[in-house]
Curated annotation (Swiss-Prot):
Zinc finger (RING-type): 14-57
Record pathway: Protein modification; protein ubiquitination
Annotated consequence of substituting residue 242 to A: Dominant-negative mutant that abolishes homooligomerization and function in membrane repair
Chief subcellular location: membrane
Biological process according to GO: exocytosis; muscle organ development; muscle system process; negative regulation of insulin receptor signaling pathway; negative regulation of insulin-like growth factor receptor signaling pathway; negative regulation of myotube differentiation; plasma membrane repair; proteasome-mediated ubiquitin-dependent protein catabolic process
Name of the protein in question: Tripartite motif-containing protein 72
UniProt gene name: Trim72
PTM-bearing positions, type S-nitrosocysteine: 144
Domain commentary: The RING domain is flexible in both the dimer and oligomer. Binding to the negatively charged phosphatidylserine lipids is mediated by the positively charged PRYSPRY domains and is inhibited by Ca(2+).
Outcome of swapping residue 55 to A: Does not affect homooligomerization
Zn finger spans (B box-type): 81-122
Regulation: Specifically binds phosphatidylserine. The binding to phospholipids enhances ubiquitination activity.
Transmembrane segments: none
Amino acid sequence: MSAAPGLLRQELSCPLCLQLFDAPVTAECGHSFCRACLIRVAGEPAADGTVACPCCQAPTRPQALSTNLQLSRLVEGLAQVPQGHCEEHLDPLSIYCEQDRTLVCGVCASLGSHRGHRLLPAAEAQARLKTQLPQQKMQLQEACMRKEKTVAVLEHQLVEVEETVRQFRGAVGEQLGKMRMFLAALESSLDREAERVRGDAGVALRRELSSLNSYLEQLRQMEKVLEEVADKPQTEFLMKFCLVTSRLQKILSESPPPARLDIQLPVISDDFKFQVWKKMFRALMPALEELTFDPSSAHPSLVVSSSGRRVECSDQKAPPAGEDTRQFDKAVAVVAQQLLSQGEHYWEVEVGDKPRWALGVMAADASRRGRLHAVPSQGLWLLGLRDGKILEAHVEAKEPRALRTPERPPARIGLYLSFADGVLAFYDASNPDVLTPIFSFHERLPGPVYPIFDVCWHDKGKNAQPLLLVGPEQEQA
């Protein structure tokens, strides 16, 4: 105590309330507090019952801490010293030590441990330190503002996490629900098919069984007749033998052929599981978009049907395009009336045996005038067919990327767009049960887009086939 008598009160004061300890407790990290102060400042405990130490943030359990009896006895002894007096010399604390930043008495200042330190009368020190209060208050306010911003950010992130988890669970539940529905429907369909096969096979087998039993009965009857003839006298034997053998040969020649049953059920193998997966993949696609062509955007050579789901290039000379910037004036193309801006979308286009076409999406603010530079940086994401056999992806390059040439060009194209995932995928949708991947763009779209359909020039009748938008009731060409 004699080494630093003025510091004893500070050491026995709670860092939270700045008063002498009241029922002091010492956390696992070594810091001590009034029990009530620790519970008040720490707030609600975590799931494991711990709170963060206000001084070092180490976890501690305030309810499990016992009162520090040594600190309590020291506090009780110090409390007997009059307020504002030296604990060692009991003289008034009238001098401020700048070096140790504490109040001391005259004896400590002149003879004790603070001798030779920078000392000020208490009144002068009070006046000088008061001038520092505004700056310290400002620092405190700035620190509070920074922490409040941090708290706001964390609270916002917490809300975002909750929303993200909610959306994730919803999406998982929705997709797995669709899978369960698909598999249940498939199981029911296969069960009905198995029941049909069993019924058909049962009818055929029972019919065959009845026929064979009837034939077998005839053979047994002939066996009895032969036994009876064997015992007949010579004349009667010879007369009946010829009749019996003739009848027997006729019966033998009428023997029914063996039954041939064609039981056709799927073989449960890895290929079966793969085929089921491919069918389920198609079933999980979003509902088919009911798109229609926008006649106001169509090149003058294009003819859009009244239903808005069929477009073809006319071989008649077309008038020049007008001044409407929504209309294509060079590219023989048209966009859909529907603007897509968020979520998931899936649509299909019947291309048939058309030898040249291009499909995809176009940025809403992309220019439709002049020759189109079909690359993503210009707001166009396209896949097309050239010369009736070469599929091309219009990527960011001087020339389109030629894809693997299919044995048979797709007659129907499926397009899947996900704004959240940044995916535009193209599929061969010719098989009504299976989608076969062709190509995918993987990038976040900069904004809303229109589905675009490049019909291409009719090429003197060689490319006159129309494009059809597939809907709930597909329009026939």
